[in-house]
From Swiss-Prot:
Forms part of the ribosomal stalk which helps the ribosome interact with GTP-bound translation factors. Is thus essential for accurate translation. One of its GO terms (cellular component) is cytosolic large ribosomal subunit. SUPFAM superfamilies: ClpS-like (SSF54736), Ribosomal protein L7/12, oligomerisation (N-terminal) domain (SSF48300). Signal peptide: none annotated. The lineage of its organism: Bacteria, Pseudomonadati, Pseudomonadota, Alphaproteobacteria, Hyphomicrobiales. GO terms for molecular function: mRNA binding; structural constituent of ribosome. CDD domains: Ribosomal_L7_L12. Keywords: Ribonucleoprotein, Ribosomal protein. Belongs to the bacterial ribosomal protein bL12 family. This is Large ribosomal subunit protein bL12. GO terms for biological process: translation.
Length: 123
């Protein structure tokens, strides 16, 4: 069980780009597809409560701004990406930086990246 807990912890610490790469590698290795099956919506699902407060946010880099070097440095610090990957992410904006983070963490990341000169959007 300790091995499984370690695997779960390691997977939880992956960045979005690393998780996508892992998914591709596993698809190739096992010969499967990670595409989600299309689900038919239930009749009662339209009446879902709309007043629920969002608890998980995606931090999306809209624009790298004029100070791209500073933004790249911040992206590297926040995501653990290498220089080339962080540069590609900043220059390929709009791109998600972090996904599924708490509101407090998303606001903190947004403030750091905006201080470096980036335009950020929380979704």
């Amino acid at each position: 069980m300790a091995d499984l807990a370690k695997i779960v912890e390691d997977l939880s610490n992956l960045t979005v780009l690393e998780a996508a790469e892992l998914s591709k590698l596993l698809e190739e290795k096992w010969g499967v597809s990670a595409a989600a099956p299309v689900a038919v919506a239930a009749v009662g699902s339209a009446a879902a409560p709309a007043a629920e407060e969002k608890t998980e946010f995606d931090v999306v880099l809209v624009d790298g701004g004029a100070q791209k070097i500073n933004v790249i440095k911040e992206v590297r610090a926040l995501t653990g990406l290498g220089l080339k990957e962080a540069k590609d992410l900043v220059e390929g904006a709009p791109k998600p930086i972090k996904e599924g983070v708490s509101k407090d963490e998303a606001e903190k990341i947004k403030a750091q990246l905006e201080a470096a000169g980036a335009k950020i959007e929380l979704k």
